[in-house]
């Protein structure tokens, strides 16, 4: 049977159809005939890349079938009715099957797999779908086969419709064919695509002569749904093939300019970047400036699916297109618009003679010759992707990239990513607005995922699709860099320009491109287009982005330039002649504004064509100005960045292209880098530039730093910033670049946006802060920019009024009695200090829990605060809320010495006078504010609060600042122990104040303690000028310091008697001179130290807060709010409490000016030198210790022979202390034992020793010439030189030591050493026995050999008294020594060897030192630690006739004195009662016995005591000669009266009553002998026979009592303190706490004796109890 058949070539022929032959054989035969007669189809099939892998070339025929022309039915077998009828008029079409025959079985199979149901149905018309019923998974072979068949069929349809008709030269006019209006060659030059619309969907129709392809939105959505539900490389290739082989506008231009050849067919590779254009080979140079490669790369327009023209175009049209695009890229400075926004229309004539208009590069991107508008393939695909993503609630791209089925297989995952890259590249090529498309990909984090994948798999960097996508991301920047601004024709350029105007010049109406107001932004002329000439649209884009997205920092920079210019005008009132700026590729150069017009003033003037760059600049900064034109600098930075990132240049090197990887991080990455670079420039300018002429240097440094950062290939913006910060912090050195990175980094962090929130503040401070009042560091609204129309310059308006109202409201809420009108000064100061946001809504919220949070203890299981390190600097929190200003003591006297001068003279006189020196900072109207903070019933506290309010105001800001200083201290510097700035106390009167006795002034400790405990103190800070001192290195500019006087001689520490009137400078301590960049990194602002004019203000904290602070520091609860009652029964000395015994009623101090000295012939040894011990040194013997072992010379003047009238006139010593130091029966042994356990070091304070060296010389008198020779100090003696004496008699109530020395002729001399026993360095400690032939042996002596070979014992006297001491006096009167021979015979005691006790004491001391090591966490030199103490006396106890003004020193607060070091040495607070009772004399027979002798000794008068000593020695010589045979230890063998000399072996001494009546009163257990710990280890302890091991048992008891506490302290267990005011338990301090932590609080290493709580007294009573009359009166009772 003959059938009329039409093939896809348009050929009509008759075919003999036989029904006995299978239908498939007929189809195959027709297909082979089609291929034979169509050479073009043969070539297509040969180059076709998507042939089914498991099928032969001939099996493609299965995609073809026959369709009846009249009914449109498809034939399926040979028995069809059409063949049976055999009508010759029946026409059949041999063509491809429809897509629905392949889509339906795949959809059913996917639905069966996802729903776990079976499906065996398949279309009967598709022979390739018969195997789909057995599929069980999306990746099964049956599904893959169906997808490959669909892909092959789709490829055949597209190729056939595009290229199948190229060789057909016939006209087909058969009426039976499908009607097609565009089927003749006359219209072949136009598009063969038309839009067919139906009520249900839109279709993309390929209306060729044999086309049956209908690509509707439903078909595209079905394909995307298949890819989404069955993601695999095969299914994804189907989608990529669909979009990659649709020609874009550029592809059609390329096809028009070339004939249909094999090169066109090879363009249809996977992700080739466009059909037939060879994009793979040329896309990498997009924007590179190569005219040969980029002529076809203007892909900004959209593409409509269509077919290529059948006829070649004329060569003239091709040349015109190439020349036009080459001019657009190579000549960006001309007036031609960019191809992305303009339309170029060219008329050309095709071979048929018809004219076609080609629209190139327009926004619509259309390419047609019809009036119909057809949707692009991009629109259909993108809409379908959005629909599928919405339907499945998952992003289409991310779903495929994160498919877990393929992520585990590396190769498959890599292939999927590459296919997605190809899809994105083709979608970008087809997109009518590729910028918006990329922005959506950035917002969906798709490109970010690709960047993260590239980190894991480095192979993708070499992938072609990755390189293409990276170039596409950079294409926009290339275009904007090369295209000039055309505001008249390009709307986007107008928008950018208007945004810049609206952000910076919003107060002016938009003036267009020609306005004088552009000069205010820093443009070089009124037409900014001239400035953008070399950077194109890119610089305008960067400026517009900066001003719009970073509005506040942008306005802040503008305001900064205005302020700099204003400061320059204030400093230079001369008229400045404006001179033009000459630029050469933005290496901006300036001309000096001096009268010198030489050409050498031009910097780097290499531009030969700069005539057009010279403008009449009206607002150009002077060459000596520190301001710069912002817009000009921005343009220069854009040019610099474009060169660094090679924007607008050819970039063929892969190494250079790697810098573009940062483009995956975000859509505005280049703009953000521009902002960061501008901040860097501002930071460098701030630290380096001194004038505008420094611009080339600053811009060079900026470029070098950015290049250094870019060389590290940052992958995103944050990585770029981190690398830049690391570079500025010098963690990575900058080669050949000397930059002040400290100031630069500080300014850089200040310009960065602040990310501080409530969580950060709570973490630091543990309390709520009104974050709404936190000012943004970049907030320009604090200084609103206004303009003056007369001068057209910007000005600023202060917001002090708003700040006043804000702070004033807080003042009203905190204190209703406050007068609103009298607080303006304080409010303004608060605004100027930039700390108004510190106001807390309720300052009472601060509690111990907050303190625990600060110190790192875990108080809430949900909140954990990190422990603060011990080396935290003061700026960490101080700068967090702004530096706290200090008071400049403008009128205070600068002289040292004396107390109460300068600041102190006017303060606290009756508690009512305010320091006049502070009135410079206080308005007179503030005198009415006497009723502020009326919350304290105590009158003295009330007065202090009124004073502080007048000085500081009652703003909660002061309380906040107090807390900050409480935590860290003003000079918390662990690297520097010796402070260069000191504070003088203003809380004490001149009578009770004293100058510093060592490197640390006394008031510093009190100041720091008050600061620590939250008490209000009004202490002005008077500091010398310090610039660049200490660890800071002088990092701040000198102009930041308020220097009013260049002389530093007038700036002394504290007020003195000098009364100088010169102003003190506001300067900084070594800690304060350190960099503030860490604080600025947090806050993002630079602190203004010039405006710090307020004094430190301390808030009264609740008592429990103070207890918490003490407990946190010392590991135990301290009842800070309770002062201990005084112990009235015991007198008090300046160093120990309860020193005076009641039995000292007969103790009378004899004035030493009545003592006469004999002029004896004595050869003085030059070693007898006084090397005075500093008063504050622990080595200096405390007065109560020393007085235990010296003679009471109360009535010595009555017993000394008056015949010695020829003596040298003695030097009159100062009057004695008003306090007579006695012995407390109950407290001394406890204090002594505790001092031993605390391991006090006994080394000299050499620094303080030198300060008093001139006052502490012991003057010696000789017969021939009077000469002052100092006696060596005890610290020059070895331990072996210190020999305890057991044959001398000692009392504890005298202040004069009588010493006898023996010269070579056997003559003796008694030397009276007068020492102020109330001084800390008193040296009256030795035992003495005076007689004929004996000498005073109470002082360690050094043995020398005289000329006769005899041993001469020279006494080494130790004195630290600053007053001159009397000379030695020799007396030979023996009659006066016989009066009281038998007074002390009943007081003898048995003497025992105490070596075991000495070992026990040494072991105890070693353990104490070990505990110090454990506590402080390091092996520091315990022997060199200086512990200092203070004495106190009441103001009323000061005696004017006493010449020693240093006796009254303010003590430590009582709570700290008792509890400060308990944790250091293992004392358990809850066992204090037991510890105290263990030393009670009623429970210790030994102590009772020793106390008995002690009281007995005190009943003797000084006169009787001396006579007793003399008579006793005479009896020893005359009556007890038999016993003297055992006392041959005397080193002077020429004298028979030697048995009272010092012996090293006390166990061999005679034990008779006469020789032992006064022995060993210096026993460690005796309360009467609490000598300095310097000599404890050389004295012997005696144990009573009744209790031979009493002392050992007490020691063991003490150790047992503190055992548990030590364990808790070391292990950090929770303490169970019974007497806590709250139930909160604390952990101990870690063992790594350094000793400097205490130094930072108290200013020095301070030692305390641990006393019983019963003996603790308040400061007032302790001060009054030190009065001499009070002590004598109490003791007489």
Curated annotation (Swiss-Prot):
The ELMO domain, residue ranges: 492-710
An annotated Gene Ontology molecular function: small GTPase binding
Biased composition (Low complexity): 115-139, 172-194, 307-334, 341-352, 597-616, 934-946, 985-996, 1285-1305, 1475-1488, 1503-1574, 1663-1677
Keyword line: Coiled coil
Gene Ontology CC terms, in alphabetical order: cell leading edge; cytoplasm; macropinosome
InterPro entries per UniProt: ELMO_dom, ELMO_domain-containing
Disulfide bonds: none
Biased composition, class Acidic residues, residue ranges: 922-933, 1228-1238, 1387-1397
Ranges of biased composition (kind: Polar residues): 1306-1334, 1445-1454
Region Disordered, annotated ranges: 112-139, 168-194, 264-372, 592-625, 775-801, 888-947, 982-1002, 1047-1075, 1122-1141, 1197-1248, 1261-1404, 1434-1454, 1467-1593, 1654-1677
Coiled-coil stretches: 1186-1212
Highest taxon listed in the record's lineage: Eukaryota
PANTHER family per UniProt: ELMO DOMAIN-CONTAINING PROTEIN E (PTHR12771:SF65), ENGULFMENT AND CELL MOTILITY (PTHR12771)
Name the record gives this protein: ELMO domain-containing protein E
Gene that this sequence comes from: elmoE
């Amino acid at each position: 049977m003959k059938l009329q058949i039409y093939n896809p070539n348009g050929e009509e022929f008759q075919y003999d159809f036989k029904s006995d032959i299978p239908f498939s054989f007929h189809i195959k035969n027709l297909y082979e005939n089609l291929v034979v007669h169509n050479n073009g189809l043969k070539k297509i099939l040969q180059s076709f890349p998507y042939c089914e892998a498991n099928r032969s070339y001939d099996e493609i025929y299965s995609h073809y079938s026959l369709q009846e022309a009249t009914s449109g039915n498809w034939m399926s077998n040979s028995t069809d009715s059409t063949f049976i009828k055999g009508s010759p008029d029946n026409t059949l079409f041999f063509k491809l099957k429809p897509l629905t025959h392949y889509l339906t079985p795949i959809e059913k199979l996917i639905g069966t797999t996802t729903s776990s149901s079976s499906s065996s149905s398949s279309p009967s018309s598709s022979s390739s779908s018969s195997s789909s019923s057995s599929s069980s998974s999306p990746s099964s072979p049956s599904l893959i086969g169906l997808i490959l068949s669909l892909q092959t069929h789709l490829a055949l349809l597209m190729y056939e419709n595009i290229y199948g008709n190229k060789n057909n030269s016939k006209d087909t006019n058969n009426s039976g064919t499908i009607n097609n209006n565009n089927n003749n060659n006359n219209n072949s030059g136009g598009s063969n695509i038309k839009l067919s619309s139906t009520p249900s969907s839109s279709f993309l129709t390929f209306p060729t002569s044999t086309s049956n392809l209908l690509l509707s939105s439903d078909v595209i959505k079905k394909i995307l749904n298949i890819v989404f539900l069955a993601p695999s490389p095969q299914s994804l290739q189907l989608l990529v093939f669909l979009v990659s082989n649709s020609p874009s506008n550029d592809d059609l231009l390329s096809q028009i300019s070339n004939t249909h050849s094999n090169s066109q067919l090879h363009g249809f590779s996977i992700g080739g970047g466009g059909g037939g254009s060879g994009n793979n080979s040329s896309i990498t140079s997009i924007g590179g400036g190569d005219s040969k490669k980029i002529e076809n790369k203007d892909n900004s327009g959209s593409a409509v699916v269509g077919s290529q023209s059948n006829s070649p175009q004329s060569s003239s049209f091709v040349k015109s297109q190439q020349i036009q695009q080459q001019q657009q890229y190579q000549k960006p400075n001309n007036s031609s618009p960019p191809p992305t926004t303009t339309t170029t229309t060219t008329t050309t004539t095709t071979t048929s003679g018809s004219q076609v208009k080609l629209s190139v590069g327009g926004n619509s991107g259309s390419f047609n010759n019809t009036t119909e508008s057809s949707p692009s393939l991009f629109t259909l695909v993108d809409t379908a992707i959005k629909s599928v993503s919405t339907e499945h609630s998952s992003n289409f791209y991310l779903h495929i990239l994160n498919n877990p089925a393929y992520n585990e297989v590396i190769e498959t995952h890599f292939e999927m990513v590459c296919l997605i890259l190809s899809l994105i590249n083709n979608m970008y090529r087809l997109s009518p607005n590729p910028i918006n498309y990329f922005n959506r990909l950035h917002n969906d984090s798709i490109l970010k995922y690709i960047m993260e994948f590239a980190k894991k798999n480095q192979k993708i960097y070499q992938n072609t699709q990755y390189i293409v996508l990276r170039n596409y991301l950079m294409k926009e920047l290339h275009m904007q860099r090369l295209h000039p601004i055309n505001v008249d024709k390009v709307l986007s350029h107008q928008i950018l320009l208007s945004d810049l105007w609206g952000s910076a010049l919003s107060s002016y109406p938009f003036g267009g491109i020609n306005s004088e107001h552009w000069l205010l932004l820093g443009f070089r002329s009124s037409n900014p287009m001239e400035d953008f000439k070399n950077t194109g649209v890119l610089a305008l884009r960067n400026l517009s982005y900066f001003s719009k997205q970073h509005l506040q920092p942008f306005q802040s920079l503008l305001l900064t330039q205005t302020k700099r210019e204003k400061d320059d005008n204030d400093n230079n009132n001369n008229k400045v002649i404006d001179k033009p700026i000459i630029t050469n590729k933005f290496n901006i150069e300036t001309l000096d504004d001096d009268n010198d017009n030489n050409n050498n003033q031009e910097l780097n003037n290499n531009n030969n064509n700069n005539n057009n760059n010279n403008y009449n600049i009206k607002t150009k900064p002077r060459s000596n100005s520190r301001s710069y034109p912002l817009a000009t600098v921005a343009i220069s930075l854009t040019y610099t960045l474009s060169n660094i990132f090679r924007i607008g240049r050819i970039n063929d090197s892969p190494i250079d292209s790697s810098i573009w990887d940062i483009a995956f991080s975000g859509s505005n990455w280049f703009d953000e880098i521009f902002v960061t670079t501008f901040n860097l420039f501002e930071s460098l300018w701030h630290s380096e530039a001194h004038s505008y002429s420094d611009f080339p240097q600053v811009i060079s440094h900026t470029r070098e730093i950015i290049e250094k950062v870019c060389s590290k290939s940052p992958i995103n913006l944050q990585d770029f910033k981190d690398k830049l910060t690391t570079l500025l912090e010098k963690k990575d050195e900058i080669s050949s670049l000397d930059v002040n990175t400290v100031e630069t980094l500080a300014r850089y962090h200040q310009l960065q946006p602040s990310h501080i929130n409530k969580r950060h503040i709570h973490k630091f401070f543990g309390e709520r802060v009104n974050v709404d009042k936190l000012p943004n560091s970049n907030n320009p609204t604090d200084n609103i920019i206004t303009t003056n129309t007369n001068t057209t310059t910007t000005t600023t308006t202060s917001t002090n009024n708003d700040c006043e109202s804000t702070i004033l409201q807080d003042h009203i809420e905190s204190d209703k009695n406050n007068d609103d009108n009298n607080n303006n000064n304080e409010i303004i100061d608060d605004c100027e200090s930039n700390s108004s946001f510190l106001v807390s809504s309720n300052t009472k919220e601060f509690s111990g829990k907050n303190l625990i949070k600060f110190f790192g203890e875990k108080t809430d299981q949900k909140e954990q605060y990190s422990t603060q390190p011990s080396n935290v600097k003061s700026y960490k929190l101080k700068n967090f809320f702004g530096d706290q200003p200090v008071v400049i003591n403008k009128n205070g006297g600068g002289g040292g010495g004396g107390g109460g001068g300068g600041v102190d003279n006017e303060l606290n006189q009756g508690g009512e006078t305010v320091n006049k020196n502070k009135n410079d900072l206080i308005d007179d109207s503030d005198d009415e504010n006497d009723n502020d903070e009326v919350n304290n019933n105590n009158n003295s506290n009330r007065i202090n609060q009124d004073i502080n309010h007048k000085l500081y105001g009652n703003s909660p800001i002061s309380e906040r600042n107090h807390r900050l200083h409480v935590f860290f201290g003003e000079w918390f510097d662990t690297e520097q122990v010796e402070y260069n700035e000191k504070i003088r106390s203003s809380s004490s009167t001149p009578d009770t104040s004293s100058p510093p006795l060592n490197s640390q002034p006394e008031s510093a400790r009190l100041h720091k303690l008050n600061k620590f405990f939250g008490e209000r103190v009004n202490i002005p800070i008077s500091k010398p000028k310090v610039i660049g001192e200490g660890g800071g290195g002088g990092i701040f500019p000198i102009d930041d310091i308020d220097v009013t006087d260049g002389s530093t001689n007038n700036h002394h520490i504290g007020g003195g008697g000098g009364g100088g009137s010169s102003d003190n400078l506001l300067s900084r301590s070594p800690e304060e001179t350190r960099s503030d960049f860490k604080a600025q990194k947090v806050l993002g602002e630079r602190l203004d130290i010039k405006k710090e004019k307020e004094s430190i203000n301390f808030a009264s904290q609740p008592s429990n807060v103070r207890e918490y602070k003490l407990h946190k520091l010392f590991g135990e609860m301290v009842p800070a709010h309770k002062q201990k009652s005084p112990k009235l029964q015991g007198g008090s000395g300046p160093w120990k409490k309860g020193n005076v015994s009641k039995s000292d009623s007969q103790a009378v101090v004899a004035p030493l000016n009545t003592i006469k000295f004999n002029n004896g012939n004595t050869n003085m040894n030059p070693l007898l030198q006084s090397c005075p011990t500093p008063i504050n040194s622990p080595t200096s013997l405390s007065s109560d210790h020393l007085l235990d072992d010296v003679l009471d010379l109360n009535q010595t003047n009555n017993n000394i022979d008056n015949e010695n009238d020829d003596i040298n006139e003695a030097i009159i010593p100062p009057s004695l202390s008003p306090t007579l130091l006695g012995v407390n029966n109950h407290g001394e042994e406890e204090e002594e034992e505790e001092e031993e356990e605390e391991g006090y070091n006994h080394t000299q304070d050499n620094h303080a020793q030198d300060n008093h060296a001139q006052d502490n010389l012991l003057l010696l008198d000789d017969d021939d010439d009077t000469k002052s020779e100092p006696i060596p100090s005890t610290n020059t003696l070895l331990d072996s030189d210190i020999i305890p004496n057991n044959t001398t008699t000692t009392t504890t109530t005298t202040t004069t030591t009588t010493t006898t020395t023996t010269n070579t002729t056997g003559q003796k001399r008694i030397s009276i050493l007068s020492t102020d026993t109330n001084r800390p360095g008193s040296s009256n400690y030795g035992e003495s026995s005076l007689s004929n032939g004996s000498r005073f042996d109470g002082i360690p002596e050094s043995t020398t050999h005289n000329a006769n070979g005899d041993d001469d014992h020279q006494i080494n006297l130790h004195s630290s008294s600053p007053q001159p001491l009397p000379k030695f006096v020799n007396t030979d009167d023996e009659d006066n020594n016989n009066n009281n021979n038998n007074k002390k015979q009943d007081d003898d005691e048995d003497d025992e060897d105490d070596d075991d006790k000495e070992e026990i004491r040494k072991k105890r001391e070693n353990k104490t030192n070990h505990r110090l090591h454990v506590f402080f966490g390091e092996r520091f030199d315990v022997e060199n630690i200086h512990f200092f103490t203070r004495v106190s006396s009441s103001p009323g106890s000061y005696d004017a006739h006493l010449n020693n003004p240093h006796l009254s020193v303010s003590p430590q607060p009582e709570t700290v004195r008792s509890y400060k070091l308990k944790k250091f040495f293992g004392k358990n607070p809850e066992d204090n009662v037991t510890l105290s009772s263990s030393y009670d004399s009623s429970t210790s027979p030994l102590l009772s016995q020793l106390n008995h002798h002690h009281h007995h000794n005190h009943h003797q008068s000084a006169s009787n005591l001396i006579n007793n000593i003399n008579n006793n020695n005479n009896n020893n010589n005359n009556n007890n000669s038999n016993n003297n045979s055992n006392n041959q230890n005397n080193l002077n063998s020429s004298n028979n009266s030697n048995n009272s000399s010092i012996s090293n072996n006390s166990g061999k001494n005679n034990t008779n009553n006469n020789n032992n009546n006064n022995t060993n009163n210096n026993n460690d257990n005796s309360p009467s002998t609490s000598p300095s710990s310097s000599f404890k280890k050389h004295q012997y302890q005696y144990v009573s026979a009744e209790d031979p091991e009493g002392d050992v048992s007490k020691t063991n008891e003490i150790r047992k009592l503190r055992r548990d506490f030590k364990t808790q302290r070391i292990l950090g267990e929770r303490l169970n303190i019974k007497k806590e005011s709250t139930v909160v338990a604390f952990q101990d301090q870690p063992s790594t706490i350094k000793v400097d932590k205490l130094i930072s609080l108290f200013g020095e290493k301070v030692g305390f004796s641990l006393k019983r709580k019963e003996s603790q007294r308040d400061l007032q009573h302790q001060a009054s109890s030190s009065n001499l009359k009070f002590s004598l009166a109490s003791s007489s009772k």
